[in-house]
Amino acid sequence: MNRKNVTRTITAIAVVVLLGWSFFYFSDDTRGYKPVDTSVAITQINGDNVKSAQIDDREQQLRLILKKGNNETDGSEKVITKYPTGYAVDLFNALSAKNAKVSTVVNQGSILGELLVYVLPLLLLVGLFVMFSRMQGGARMGFGFGKSRAKQLSKDMPKTTFADVAGVDEAVEELYEIKDFLQNPSRYQALGAKIPKGVLLYGPPGTGKTLLARAVAGEAGVPFFTISGSDFVEMFVGVGASRVRDLFEQAKQNSPCIIFVDEIDAVGRQRGAGLGGGHDEREQTLNQLLVEMDGFGDRAGVILIAATNRPDILDPALLRPGRFDRQIPVSNPDLAGRRAVLRVHSKGKPMAADADLDGLAKRTVGMTGADLANVINEAALLTARENGTVITGPALEEAVDRVIGGPRRKGRIISEQEKKITAYHEGGHTLAAWAMPDIEPIYKVTILARGRTGGHAVAVPEEDKGLRTRSEMIAQLVFAMGGRAAEELVFREPTTGAVSDIEQATKIARSMVTEFGMSSKLGAVKYGSEHGDPFLGRTMGTQPDYSHEVAREIDEEVRKLIEAAHTEAWEILTEYRDVLDTLAGELLEKETLHRPELESIFADVEKRPRLTMFDDFGGRIPSDKPPIKTPGELAIERGEPWPQPVPEPAFKAAIAQATQAAEAARSDAGQTGHGANGSPAGTHRSGDRQYGSTQPDYGAPAGWHAPGWPPRSSHRPSYSGEPAPTYPGQPYPTGQADPGSDESSAEQDDEVSRTKPAHG
């Protein structure tokens, strides 16, 4: 409820209250009479100071007009008082004895007055009730709680277009097709294509699913309704199904249109057995949604777009084609996507010359579009805090650290000993990673406290990777255990600072053994599967599907991996202890070191050989033959530029080639005087239906026709005054007799024998 409606409602209530008060004020005929005690009135009567009197029997009140005002009446000559029940006759007799003029009035109650007394307060209460109901949305309480709470975007709202979306080109392409279908349906309908009924956007939080929906709303040019999945189900039973029906009814009235349901997992969760004894309100709502999306009812022109972070818990009936024809993954952007996202969010912001967005894109692997937008915004806020005018490279660097680790803890007082331990701990991580051959190089190491960490070392990959080898994962274990190894080597005892490192190492080692099958002892087997009920979040119901002996072997393999990585880190730090001391000293002095400074410190550090203790293939001997080289590697060897432009998919080239061929055929047919189907224009007749209106095409080579087809003109029914019918279809070869001629069937058979290819 906006401010204008609130002001209007309050004004209406004030007017009603003012009118009611005016009615009661001006209808009161006792105005001008001074209320006095009953004893004062009796004193005036006994003192013969009453000129006239009026007894209101129904109201049990006495009005006196005095001959002269006095102190008891405060000088007023008109007084009014109440008298007890049954004393009207005594008052009349007393006034008559004093020769005062007495009149008795018995008022009859006004029906209008009675109604106003009871109805006006009721109207006020109803008005307040309606006002508060509308202020709370009108759907939670009061009337219309079963109505849909979907909001239709108006033209006045700020529009988001596909130009504002970056990093998810595949999703944009899929959604742009829907927008193009709504605006140019003829191109698709000519091919018999049908518009998708539903599109599901799924992916991690912050990847731009809702932003894509807003872009579709800004460019579709059709009514766009948006609603959250949690808006369907509330405290009233049956409200969810009612709102689903009302939503689609509203959409059908505005067809063609688009409905966007955000967080559809709130209502589309997989149906279960109703654990806990609760009602099936959610299932009832889901069933109604399934029927509305693809049931007996017609929903032509209504496209449903939904977004979720958990596609794995959605009901299978909701995901089938016909309901959600397209399921579009919206994942974290790659390097090119991050560059595009940073360019979009930095547009309109003053950037300094040292603000390297390409380098920033390389250092933000794994960040979503929302994270990158937050980085740019944090850099702008930091610049404004320091009264700067342009966003610099250091501001972007600080913004990345704030987004990853939180703000710097400036007020924390750290002792020299703790600072020294932190320097050696982070130095151990950095040196161990630098000496391993299969790990991303360290970009930055710092001992500045942020959030819950006392320092961190950042390893930035050179390029995006979708796969990790066993050697890379072992190198990650060595990197994680480098801090604990440095503590034990230098200070002869561990600290609690390695808790997150141990947790991360355990997670990596256990996944290598139980998920990725990298242990030769346990084999390529996945151990442990989820058997949980969807209403328990699935993961809460995980049960082991292996024996206790296998569980013990898993623990042994995990411990073996971590111990090997721990030992490798220890040996690296022992060999390069002087380098570790130099690195720790630089960290204590500068607090933060970057790649160029680390390269000068680690100039003498050589890469270690790979750990081979887990390279056993169980009797399977790998081949010594190297793999083939990729076209890119061959181009680099030849000194050619690479990468080359990515070719279009094969199906696109095939479609383009077929389209060009069809257009060429149509143009040739038009030049020879034939219509769209290869027949003379205007020769199609209803009488042709006896034999079929087109020449049959059995998929044979061009120039071949069926024996005896079309029938001879002498066998066709004749129509007076009408020319012989023609049969549109595939053009006949040059020199072939016209189907409408009198050529004998034998001659046609000879022609077929000459043109038909031999089979055998």
Curated annotation (Swiss-Prot):
Subcellular location: Cell membrane
Keywords linked to the UniProt accession: ATP-binding, Cell membrane, Hydrolase, Membrane, Metal-binding, Metalloprotease, Nucleotide-binding, Protease, Transmembrane, Transmembrane helix, Zinc
Binding site for ATP: G203, P204, P205, G206, T207, G208, K209, T210
Cofactor(s) named in the record: Zn(2+)
Ranges of Low complexity composition bias in the record: 650-669
Residues passing through the membrane, by range: 6-26, 111-131
CDD domains, A to Z: RecA-like_FtsH
Annotated binding of Zn(2+), by residue: H425, H429, D501
GO cellular component: cytosol; plasma membrane
Residue ranges annotated as Cytoplasmic topological domain: 1-5, 132-760
Main location: membrane
Compositionally biased tracts (Acidic residues): 740-750
Annotated GO biological process: protein catabolic process; proteolysis; regulation of gene expression; response to oxidative stress
EC number: 3.4.24.-
Comment on bound cofactor: Binds 1 zinc ion per subunit.
Listed SUPFAM superfamilies: FtsH protease domain-like, P-loop containing nucleoside triphosphate hydrolases
UniProt topological domain (Extracellular) ranges: 27-110
A Pfam family that the UniProt record links to this protein: FtsH_ext
Positions of the catalytic residues: E426
GO MF entry, a single one: ATP binding
Region (Disordered): 616-760
The family this protein is said to belong to: In the central section; belongs to the AAA ATPase family.
Physiological role: Acts as a processive, ATP-dependent zinc metallopeptidase for both cytoplasmic and membrane proteins. Plays a role in the quality control of integral membrane proteins. Complements an E.coli null mutation. Upon overexpression in E.coli has been shown to degrade endogenous sigma-32, SecY and phage lambda cII protein.
PANTHER family: ATP-DEPENDENT ZINC METALLOPROTEASE YME1L1, METALLOPROTEASE M41 FTSH
Quaternary state and interactors: Homohexamer.
Protein name, per record: ATP-dependent zinc metalloprotease FtsH
Gene: ftsH
